[in-house]
């Protein structure tokens, strides 16, 4: 049976891939119907490689097609405190929940259609009435703390719009996962109310490259960040967003930060993820600091797999886990 490891409050459990946990230990929800493409072994890795080659291929020389939201959805480009934001809203929301999306891209790239499409799924599985995608400033022009300032501005703007903090979910992947944790730390230190939950997909938790970790052990396995990808030549470089800060500064690398007093975290990663080790360290640090945390490791899956491989069964399972996590921690 495929398994992944989960940490809840520092307690590790091994669960089957088809079984999603309920909110109590020793209980499980019914085995859900398997959805998505099911692949194993070499067939799965070959498929992932093919999909990533297509994703990273140079764009065709033709006029890009503007993003179109699904039928019935609201979609608008707005500004909150001078920060560009894109707002998506499903046609028939059944809750007051709001998602603040912090996109990935190594703090080097802006919002793309990949993330707009991802936002639709994020809204669906979190039962959100609206989702705000933040177009924060990024390197190399803008360095720390530009992205954090923009994320904090939008969060406080949502509060000013009378959005309850208990209705807010911060959802970040990769660099956006880093930003989500750093935003929560900033809110705590400034005495501002915390969101209800943090959902972190393959968060970038350590700016320093360390040999002998998944950064090297998964280099040939991770088809999203590893060998043969556009990111591979830069993995040992100093991230431009760091500016003049040491790479182990807790403002850059949350594995070195005080993680007490933060909202419940769901950390999802893959056993082939280049950032697996630091995600494990982040989960252990959060648990040690008293923050409720769940770490799920999906077998043989790469970095940010639900974002770039949404059609696979593991991605459907990851989104179902998000749904259950949100149901557990959001106030009815």
What is each of the regions a protein language model found here?
Residues 1-11:
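N-terminal Sec-pathway targeting helices
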Residues 19-29:
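Bacterial Sec-dependent signal peptides at the C-terminal "C-region" and cleavage site
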Residues 30-51, 55, 59-332:
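Alpha/beta-hydrolase superfamily serine-hydrolase fold, recognizing
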Residues 11-19:
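Bacterial N-terminal signal peptides
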């Amino acid at each position: 049976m495929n398994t992944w490891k989960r940490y809840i409050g520092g307690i590790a459990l091994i669960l089957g891939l088809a079984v999603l946990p309920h909110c109590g230990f020793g209980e499980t929800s019914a085995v859900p119907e398997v959805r998505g493409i099911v692949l194993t072994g070499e067939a799965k890795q070959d498929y992932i490689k093919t999909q990533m080659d297509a994703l990273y291929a140079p764009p065709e020389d033709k006029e890009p097609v503007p993003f179109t939201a699904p039928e019935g959805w609201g979609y608008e480009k707005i500004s909150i405190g001078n920060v560009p934001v894109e707002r998506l809203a499903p046609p028939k929301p059944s809750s007051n929940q709001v998602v603040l999306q912090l996109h990935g891209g190594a703090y080097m790239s802006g919002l793309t259609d990949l993330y707009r499409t991802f936002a639709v799924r994020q809204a669906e599985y979190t039962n959100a009435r609206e989702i705000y995608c933040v177009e924060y400033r990024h390197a190399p022009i803008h360095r720390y703390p530009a992205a954090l300032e923009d994320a904090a501005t939008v969060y406080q703007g949502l509060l000013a719009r009378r959005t309850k903090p208990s209705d807010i979910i911060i959802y970040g992947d990769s660099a956006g996962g880093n930003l989500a944790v750093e935003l929560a730390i900033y809110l705590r230190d400034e005495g501002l109310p915390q969101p209800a939950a943090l959902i972190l997909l393959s968060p970038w938790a350590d700016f320093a490259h360390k040999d002998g970790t998944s950064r090297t052990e998964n280099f040939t396995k991770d088809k999203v960040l590893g060998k043969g990808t556009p990111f591979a030549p830069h993995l040992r470089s100093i991230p431009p967003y760091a500016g003049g800060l040491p790479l182990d500064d807790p403002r850059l690398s949350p594995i070195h930060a005080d993680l007490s007093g933060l909202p419940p975290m769901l950390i999802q990663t893959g056993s082939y993820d280049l950032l697996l080790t630091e995600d494990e360290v982040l989960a252990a640090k959060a648990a040690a600091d008293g923050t409720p945390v769940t770490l799920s490791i999906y077998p043989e899956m790469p970095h940010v797999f639900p974002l770039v491989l949404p059609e696979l069964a593991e991605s459907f399972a990851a989104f179902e886990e998000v749904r259950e996590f949100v149901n557990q921690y959001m106030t009815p």
